[in-house]
A protein has these predicted regions:
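Bacterial N-terminal signal peptides
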Residues: 1-7
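Sec/Tat signal peptide C-region and signal peptidase I cleavage site
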Residues: 8-12
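Extracellular/lumen-exposed scaffold segments
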Residues: 13-163
């Protein structure tokens, strides 16, 4: 939980929020194709003891991944992966881009074209610098004709000044 005790802290927090928004916008991955319909990339943004873990995914035209699937449906929803080294602690839940209702299956939510996911992390007092954050996604990509086998893609991101 983030506690803002003064206007200065609130200003610093909103400045970090703006940096996160810019980082989400600027993060790119390779162009998806029909042969490789989903591409993703990840990075971290570091400001003092606050860290934002950012994952962005792109889908080729006509392809989608699932955000929410009712238990009666056979599709596999996306799972965000976050493994933290000692001294780092996750704060809250994943912030996610807005999914869309899937016209073919009521109750199913999907991502088309792109999606992003952000998780906040804090460094514990006295924690040493460095370490590696593992993050990524487990997902199933589908188009209107087929669903590919699920894929897990993980990135190892070094926690160091300048991220």
């Amino acid at each position: 939980m983030i506690f803002l005790s003064s206007g200065l802290c609130a200003s610093a927090q909103s400045a970090f929020e703006k940096k996160i928004t810019a980082a989400v916008t600027q993060l790119t991955s390779t162009e998806p194709t029909n042969e490789n319909p989903v591409t993703l990339n990840a990075r971290i943004l570091l400001e003092k003891d606050s860290i934002a873990v950012i994952v962005k995914v792109r889908m080729a035209p006509g392809w989608h991944v699932y955000q929410y699937v009712p238990s009666t449906m056979p599709y596999i929803p996306i799972e965000q992966i976050l493994k933290l080294p000692e001294g780092l602690q996750a704060v809250g839940k994943w912030e996610i881009s807005k999914p869309f209702p899937f016209a073919n299956d009521p109750g199913v939510l999907i991502y088309e074209r792109q999606a992003w996911f952000v998780h906040r992390v804090v460094r514990s007092a006295g924690a040493r610098s460095g370490g590696v954050i593992q993050t990524g996604l487990y997902y199933q990509a589908c188009d209107l004709r087929q669903c590919l086998p699920p894929v897990e893609k993980i990135f190892d991101l070094k926690v160091e000044p300048g991220n």
